[in-house]
Regions:
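Conserved active-site "lid/cap" helical segment
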Residues: 2-64, 68-76, 80-83, 162-174, ...
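Flexible glycine-/small-residue-enriched beta->alpha junction loops
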Residues: 112-165
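N-terminal extracellular/periplasmic Venus flytrap/periplasmic-binding protein-like
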Residues: 8, 13-15, 25-35, 43, ...
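Beta-strand segments within the central parallel beta-sheet cores of soluble alpha/beta enzyme folds
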Residues: 49-57, 83-88, 113-118, 176-183, ...
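Active-site-proximal alpha-helical scaffold in enzymes
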Residues: 89-119, 167-196, 257-264, 329, ...
C-alpha cells in the first residue's frame, strides 16, 4: 500500500470509563457512542454527511434495542443514508471494528469510516427463556453480562478461571499478579493527576433534576492503592487460586472510536492525522487459556508490518487479568517499561466491547505526546482469541 493510500487516524476520542453502576449507570451504550461520534467529526472538521459508515463493537446488546450502532449513528446526527452496524468479537470488538474500517477503505468501499466500540455493562439485562411458560416453582434468571460477556462457552466457567489456568501454565504467582496490579493503579493515578488522558476524553453531560453532571474523568481508577490492601483479598474464582478482584480488570461502561480515511484524503482535507495503521492480525488459541491470545496475534501483526518486537516504542496490551498480562509480557519478551505506561484495564476499567478502541486511543495519543514512532495495541478475547494492531507515526 502506497503512502497516499495508507489508512490513517484522522481523529480519535473516547468517553471517560465509568464504574459499574457508577456515573453512567442509567446511560445506554448508544448514547455514549453518539457523543464519541460527534466528537470525532468535530475534531477532524468532517461533516456528518461525509461519513460512509459507522462500525461499532458491542458485546452486551440484549434489550438494548435494534442495532445499537445505528442508534448511536442517528443520535449523533448522522444522516439516515449513512449505514451503521455492530460486531461482537468479545473483548476485541472495538479494535476489530477499526480493522474492518481500515479494510473497507483499503478495498475502495468507503472513504470515511467511524469505527470503535461502546458498552454499558451496568445496563446489561437479566433474562430467561419463558416462551413455553413456567407451570410451577421458581425460575432462575440468567445474568447476560456473565453469560454473554464473561463466561467461557466451551468449558463452562468464568473468564477468571482461564486466568487461573494461564497463571499455572506460565508460573505466575499471586505476588507477581498483585505487584502488577498495583503498578497499573499507580501509573493510572499518576497519568490522571498529570492530565495525560485529557486529550482522549470527551466530556459527557448527564442531566438530572438537581442539575447537570459532567463526566470527564475515568471513574474507576483507585488513588492511593496499596499492596497491603490487595494482599488481604481472597481469590475470586478458585478458593485455592491467585486471581482476585484487585488483580483483575473492572466491570465498566464507556465508548471510544476513531475516524479513518486514507492519507491522501486527509491531505486533501487539510487534516493532520494522529497516526497510520501499519497492520493488524487476529489469532486463535485454546479457550481455556484465552488470555494468551495476544501472543500469536501480536507476532502476526508485527510480521505483517515488517517489524520486530525491538522496534516498538509503546505497547497497549489490555489487562483483562494481571495473570494473563504478565503471561503476554513473558511470551512476547518485550520491554515491560513500554507497556501500558499510563496503566491499563485493571486500573482504568474494561468496558468489554469498547476496550479495543479505548486502548487504541490511549496508544495513539501517548505516541503523539512522546514522539514515539511505532506502537502496538493488543487484547485477549474470550473464547480463545487475540487481536493486535500496529500503528506508526507519520
Amino acid at each position: 500500500m502506497s503512502a497516499s493510500n495508507a489508512i490513517v487516524v484522522a481523529s480519535a476520542a473516547r468517553t471517560a470509563v465509568g464504574s459499574f453502576n457508577g456515573a453512567f449507570a442509567a446511560t445506554p451504550a448508544h448514547e455514549l457512542g453518539a457523543v464519541v461520534i460527534r466528537e470525532l467529526l468535530s475534531r477532524a472538521g468532517v461533516e456528518a454527511a461525509e461519513v460512509d459508515e459507522v462500525i461499532l463493537g458491542q458485546v452486551l446488546t440484549a434489550a438494548q434495542g435494534q442495532n445499537p450502532a445505528r442508534q448511536a449513528s442517528i443520535n449523533a446526527g448522522l444522516p439516515i443514508e449513512t449505514t451503521a452496524w455492530g460486531l461482537n468479537q468479545v473483548c476485541g470488538s472495538g479494535l476489530r471494528a477499526i480493522a474492518i474500517g481500515m479494510q473497507q477503505i483499503a478495498g475502495g468501499d468507503a472513504k470515511v469510516i467511524v469505527a470503535g466500540g461502546q458498552e454499558s455493562m451496568s445496563l446489561s439485562a437479566h433474562a430467561q427463556h419463558l416462551r413455553a411458560g413456567v407451570k410451577m416453582g421458581d425460575y432462575k434468571m440468567i445474568d447476560t453480562m456473565i453469560k454473554d460477556g464473561l463466561w467461557d462457552a466451551f468449558n463452562g466457567y468464568h473468564m477468571g478461571i482461564t486466568a487461573e489456568n494461564v497463571a499455572k501454565q506460565f508460573q505466575i504467582t499471586r505476588d507477581d499478579q498483585d505487584a502488577f496490579a498495583l503498578a497499573s493503579q499507580n501509573k493510572a493515578e499518576a497519568a490522571q493527576k498529570a492530565g495525560r488522558f485529557k486529550d482522549e476524553i470527551v466530556a459527557f453531560t448527564i442531566k438530572g433534576k438537581k442539575g447537570d453532571t459532567i463526566v470527564d474523568q475515568d471513574e474507576y481508577i483507585r488513588h492511593g492503592a496499596t499492596l497491603d490492601a490487595m494482599t488481604k483479598l481472597k481469590p475470586a474464582f478458585d478458593k485455592d487460586g491467585t486471581v482476585t478482584a484487585a488483580n483483575a480488570s473492572g466491570i465498566n461502561d464507556g465508548a471510544a472510536g476513531a475516524l479513518l480515511m486514507t492519507e491522501a484524503e486527509a491531505v486533501r482535507r487539510g487534516i493532520t492525522p494522529l497516526a497510520r495503521i501499519a497492520s493488524w492480525a487476529t489469532a486463535g488459541v485454546d479457550p481455556s487459556v484465552m488470555g494468551t491470545g495476544p501472543i500469536p496475534a501480536s507476532k502476526r501483526a508485527l510480521e505483517k508490518a515488517g517489524w520486530k518486537v525491538s522496534d516498538l516504542d509503546l505497547v497497549e496490551a489490555n489487562e483483562a487479568f494481571a495473570a494473563q498480562a504478565c503471561a503476554v509480557n513473558k511470551g512476547l519478551g518485550w520491554n515491560p517499561d513500554i507497556v501500558n505506561v499510563n496503566g491499563g484495564a485493571i486500573a482504568i476499567g474494561h468496558p468489554i466491547g469498547a476496550s479495543g478502541a479505548r486502548i487504541f486511543n490511549t496508544l495513539v495519543f501517548e505516541m503523539k505526546r512522546r514522539g514515539a514512532k511505532k506502537g502496538l495495541a493488543t487484547l485477549c478475547i474470550g473464547g480463545g482469541m487475540g487481536v493486535a494492531m500496529c500503528v506508526e507515526a507519520l
